[in-house]
Amino acid sequence: MISGLTKRFALTFLMMGVVCLAAAQTEGHEEGVNNAHNAHESHGGQEADHNPLDDGEHGDFIAGDFIIHHIADANEINFFSDFSAPLPMIFYVEGKGFDIFMSSKFQTEGDDHGAHGAHAIKTATGPSTGTIYIKDPDLGISSKGGESFYDISITKSVFGMMFIMTLLVLVLRSMAKSYTRRPGQAPNGLTNFLEPLVLFVRDDIAVPIIGKTKADKFLPFLLTTFFFIVASNLLGLIPFIGGFNITGTIGVTIVLAFVVFVITTVNGNKQYWGHLFWPPGVPNLVKLLVVPIEVFGMFLKPTVLMIRLTANMSAGHIIILSFVSLVFIFNQNYGEVAGFGMGVFSTMFMIFMYFLELLVAFLQAYVFTLLAAIYFADATQEAHH
């Protein structure tokens, strides 16, 4: 059974990964504006491309910019202050076609825009269409000639999801083959670590809440959601590899919550819709108040699901980065000794926070999966007599 479940899980994960990738690309990647001065905010994380340590009138450290720089999405993966890996920029210009190039092609214009360093405006010329793209740290990306374009570039979050999707599909396929090669035998290696997690989602979440007869129908999605969130959260905890914040990206959590809403709505039975639009045992006059509240609650549930995951995962990163910021602030305002002392304290606190974030990484995956299972159970429960 585990072998068949793992294969369905891998297929469901692949499908969900494609949907999440598309959503993450469209989040903040809308149609280009018609002029450079009215640039739309197509990349919510473009400000992450500059170094906040250079901000301020005299190179002063600005904590807010530093934190946003690390948790926002971007078109590059920043490893150190002076080293980053560029990602593909993909633009579709209406009537001209596609422009594909690496984000490192954007170069500072210099005195033409009167900006240098952190707030320098950069430009790049599309290799296919000849369109000149202007990259403003505050306004996003626009075209110099007013061409209308669509930005479907690979961002840091999209790259992270592609990596996770590839890794988990390979691991799960290997896990399924392991059961096929060694039927009836105890699992070994990585399978020995993953099987308890699969059984946990099945035996402690899906079956007790949804019911044994209906749990298998929703189990592939619940496993997909659980492992995707866990893997995304753990990737975000690895230091010095770009500061991934996948589940803190609203476009990703919107898709996860929307899929939960669609599955709940599609699988809702007569009992579910009856309780929603005509609650039994409620006076007719009271129903005029209850029904709108119930309908509003139907849309509120996935919204809360989305906000809870995004806020909790972003909050952990913000707290850690805030204590990192204190080191620079104390060093800047009170000298190197104060900065060193704060560095020792901040390091100890950040170690504690990392262990706490490790717990939260699994806890948030559990909570999201648990609530999804509860919604599915509410939609499919039979009438009680």
Predicted regions and their residues:
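Membrane-interface helix caps and helix-loop-helix hairpins in membrane proteins
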Residues: 239-244
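Membrane-interfacial loop-to-helix junctions in multi-pass inner-membrane proteins
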Residues: 5, 185-189, 210-219
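Bacterial N-terminal signal peptides
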Residues: 10-20
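Hydrophobic transmembrane alpha-helix segments characteristic of membrane transport
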Residues: 170-209, 271
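Cytosolic juxtamembrane amphipathic/interface segments immediately preceding
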Residues: 144-149, 201-215
